[in-house]
Amino acid sequence: MKTRYAKRRKKLKIMVFIVLVSIGILFALFVKKNKSEHEGINMAQACKVIAYACGYQPSDGHGNYWYDEYIDYVREKQIFTDFKAKDAFTRKYAKELFSYCGVNFTEELYSYDTFSNEQFSQLIYELKDFFSSGDNLSWVEAAVVATPDMDSQLSGWSVCTDKGIYSFKGLKLSGKVDKNCVFLTCGSEILMFV
């Protein structure tokens, strides 16, 4: 009798273990899927675009990270109240940007909590006339032909497109080669993919 119950208990423990592991795997997949669906522009990327739109001229070697000088510039201008570089660009920051530009924020047009690259690009396009150097921004359709990994003649922060060579900082080029993309540029610098 005792061995029969011991065998049942062992089988039950194994089944519970399998169920718990399965639930854990499903939960991890769900979290990963939702995270990738909601990834958008972060404050470091947004500050870079906004700094260029305001006429900021970047220097070489400022800070520990590629985005330090842009964040310092935006903080100095007091465009946003409180943020971290890796924070998502949210509706709160969009309101602060509109306020900085002296434009009324329209809740209905910007109902999303976080902004994708495309949504942020549209927001910048609508505000470009309110920035001191907004007319220096361009939206260029191009295909990435080569990256520094592929061509040793390209410097570490350069990319070759079918429209010419552009510099970039803080962008991930994986998955962009041989694909038509829209870039937000300022001169020969790619600020972001749209």
Features from the language model and the residues they span:
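N-terminal propeptides
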Residues: 2-172
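Residue-level signal for tight coil/turn positions that link beta-strands
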Residues: 163, 187-188
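Short nucleic-acid-contacting surface segments enriched for D/E, G, S/T with interspersed K/R
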Residues: 172-183, 187
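OB-fold/S1-family single-stranded nucleic acid-binding modules
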Residues: 189-194
